[in-house]
Amino acid sequence: TTGTVGSSLTGSYGNLTLNSDGSYSYELDANNTDLQKISTGEYLYETFTYTITDEAGQTATAQITIRIEGINDAPSAVNDKETLDLDETSEITNFDDSSKYVKANDTDVDQMDNISIDSVRSGKTNESGSSITVGSAFTAQYGSITFFADGGYNYTANSGLRDSLKPGEKIYEYFTYTITDSKGLT
């Protein structure tokens, strides 16, 4: 692609503006998915070739190479919902089905980053309810739950809960979890 001095030239990862005095500016394309994938310690390079001409019409060609250093992006958590039909069972166990883990739909754009469950609380927000220790059973309002760092969990409804509900009655139990990537961002 050919550009004009003083105008923006679009590259693979951003836009370069080269001025007639030799100065230049480079602006990254924040929406570029390739840029989002690189993590701390990883690099991408973008090279632009330019030609200069002197008053006698003599030309020379050179290159500007931009080194783009990756940064650690925070992971993104997505709300999960599980339904327990007490007419069928009193327990939710998903140890053997990772597609049902709470972190199965959570992501981190850094390709090599691993996500783990860092903390859990009872309630709808991080500020509400009680702290739950990952890996330990917690007695909640309607049952007992154990969350695991890999996103698996086990929930067992309280004994007698089924008999205490009216036909068709629905109750809700909320838990809030925080995920952390391998570099400590949540």
For each predicted feature, which ranges?
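Extracellular ectodomain surface segments
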Residues: 1-11, 60, 74-138
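Acidic, turn/loop-rich segments in luminal/extracellular domains of secretory-pathway
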Residues: 5-70, 131-186
